[in-house]
Amino acid sequence: MQCDFVDRILNEYDLLNAIVYRSKFTHEVKVGDVIIGGNNPIVVQSMALGGSGDVYQDAREVLELAQAGSELVRIAINSDKAIKSVPYIRDVLINHGFNSKMIIGCGQYEIARLVKQYPECALALGKIRINPGNIGFGDKRDKNFEDIIEFAIKNDIPIRIGVNWGSLDKYLAAKLMHDNSLRGTPDPDYVVLRKALVISAITSAKHAEKVGLPANKIVISCKVSKVRDLISVYTMLSKICDYPLHLGLTEAGSGVKGIVGSSAGISYLLLHGIGNTIRVSLTQQPGESRTNEVKLCQEILQSIGLRNFSVQVTSCPGCNRTNPKYFHQLVSDVNKYVADRMSVWKNANPGVENMTIAVMGCVVNGPGESKHANLGISMPGYGERSVAAVYQNGEKLCTLEGNNIFEQFVSIIENYVSIYYH
């Protein structure tokens, strides 16, 4: 009986891994030096707040996002001034060593005019995002859409067709709602709206292909503000198309709510092989930088094992066994030290982002967790001998004591990085 149970666990585990970690096939879309889709790493995106009216300030913001690790940065193209600023922002990025085509232009009904009026500025964009729900209205809608697509074809620029819950094509939504009302058992409204999002995205993409845009120049997104809607919509998209998918929870909110919602939805989809590029959209607190969105994207990818961006510091929460005065301070100091050193390590020590460091509070789980990491330190808890055991590659290396345990441990970290990542 026990053997049967063990065999079942092992078989179920293998099956789960086969399902969860198999990426869905998609076309590859090249945006400058970045490739979205195929078997390429999930791409991190962000959007600049902009709107300062100062091109130098806007350029600084885009640069900060790039320096934080955003591989593509979207900016709003909603005025003559906005589109004329694109070449300058691009040049700032190039001068700092970044991808010359990492800027994505995002516009609504006005973007067709701006691209046509300032083509030399639009050529500095790496990709253009258009929303079928507000690209135009009435008889101008299809013409505006086709003008953008033709510009993209002529200049070899990829397009993201981004449908949004808040600006869904009202004619399509009304028709689907009407048709649904005539059914014997109508679907709930939210189901109809989910279907409308997918239909809008796919029909727009197919229309772009009909105009002449190759499939490998198209990325799709369907943004909603609820996690279950996000999962449902993108699961449908993944089943019926091979376009790369841009994931994100729109209007996610701020603080813990926005972080949890975005992390839950994006992680679920990525772990089921759905999604090729991600953006987290949070409402900033006053004075908060949008670079936090980039860091959150990176943390999502690193926490689910899809990409590594930084040395991972593992630590326990602490309990009545630990000495919070020393333990919590050590955790804080190690995290800060790693964050400060990453820019140097990444250039001088390739692969260091795959390293793990464990900082543990007592003997209960400390030694075991430390042995799982590249380097680990197990602090003395209440009632334990006042020494900290250090483990390296699963073996005990030494014990530290005194008032400068942090400085001693940092020296060990630096030595490890220099030996194993060079």
Curated annotation (Swiss-Prot):
Keywords: 4Fe-4S, Iron, Iron-sulfur, Isoprene biosynthesis, Metal-binding, Oxidoreductase. Its cofactor is [4Fe-4S] cluster. It comes from the Bacteria. GO terms for biological process: isopentenyl diphosphate biosynthetic process, methylerythritol 4-phosphate pathway; terpenoid biosynthetic process. Pathway: Isoprenoid biosynthesis; isopentenyl diphosphate biosynthesis via DXP pathway; isopentenyl diphosphate from 1-deoxy-D-xylulose 5-phosphate: step 5/6. Gene3D superfamilies: Dihydropteroate synthase-like, Sulfite Reductase Hemoprotein, domain 1. Pfam families: GcpE. It catalyses: (2E)-4-hydroxy-3-methylbut-2-enyl diphosphate + oxidized [flavodoxin] + H2O + 2 H(+) = 2-C-methyl-D-erythritol 2,4-cyclic diphosphate + reduced [flavodoxin]. The keyword Magnesium does not apply. Disulfide bonds: none annotated. It is an enzyme of class 1 (oxidoreductase). Belongs to the IspG family. This is 4-hydroxy-3-methylbut-2-en-1-yl diphosphate synthase (flavodoxin). It comes from Ehrlichia ruminantium (strain Welgevonden).
